Amino acid sequence: LAIDPANTAARMTLLGEAVRQEDYKEIMNLCEAGVESNPDMLEFYFYLAIAYNQAERTDDALAICQKALSHVKDDSKKEVVSDFYAIIGDAYHTKNLHAEAYAAYDSALVYNPSNIGALNNYAYYLSVERRDLDKAEEMSYKTVKAEPNNSTYLDTYAWILFVKGNYAEARLYIDEAIKNDKDSSDVVLEHCGDIYYMTGDAEGALKYWKQAWDKGNRSDTLKQKIQKKKYISDETKPAE
C-alpha cells in the first residue's frame, strides 16, 4: 500500500483483518486513505463511519456518510445506501436532532424496507418520545419476526406495547428479552420492572429495578421507583 495506495485488493484484505479484530484505529487508518485513493468504493466509507461511531466522533460519522451518498450510482447496492442513511439517523439522534433523524430513517427504509437496525432504532426512539406508536409497533414487529431471539429487538417491542398500555403482551416479550440475554443491560432490566409493576407484580418489579440499579443506572426516576416501590413515569416528551 505504501508503494501503491490504490491497491484495493490489498487494502480490502487488511481491512477484513482489522474488522475481524475490531481494531477501530486500524480501520480508520485504512479507510481514511481508502476514500482518498478509491473515492467510489463505498465499503471504505461504511467501515469508516462505523469506526467513527465507535470513537464517538458523531460529526465525522455524519460527514463521511454524507460524502458517501454523493458517490452513490444507479448500480450501487440499495442495502448499502440504506445503511448509510441509518447511520445518519443514529448520528442525528445522538445530536438530539430528532426530525432530521426520522427523515434519515425514512430514507433508509425507502432503499431497504427490511433494514432491521433502522427499523428497530426508529421504532424505539418514537416510543421514547411516545409518538406515532402504531407505526413504531409495526416497524418493531418486523424486527422480532426477522430475529425472534434478539433481546434488543424483543425489548423494543415490549417497550412499545408497554407505552401503548398492552401490559400483558409486553410482559411476554420482555420475559423473552431477558431469557435471550443472560447479561441484560440496565435499560432492559428497568423496562422489565416497569412492565412487571403494571401487570400487578410489584415484588418482581422491585427485583428488576434493583438489578438495574446494580448495573449502574443512577437515574432519579429509578431511585424513586425503588424507594416508593411503585412505577413512576419518566416521560421525556408528552404524548402527541
Model-predicted segments: where are they?
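Position-specific recognition of the canonical hydrophobic site in helix A of tetratricopeptide repeat
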Residues: 19, 53, 86, 93, ...
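Residue-level recognition of tetratricopeptide repeat
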Residues: 7, 16, 41, 50, 75, 81, 90, 124-125, ...
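Canonical tetratricopeptide repeat
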Residues: 13-14, 47, 87, 121, ...
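Structural marker of alpha-solenoid helical repeat scaffolds
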Residues: 3, 37, 71, 75-77, ...
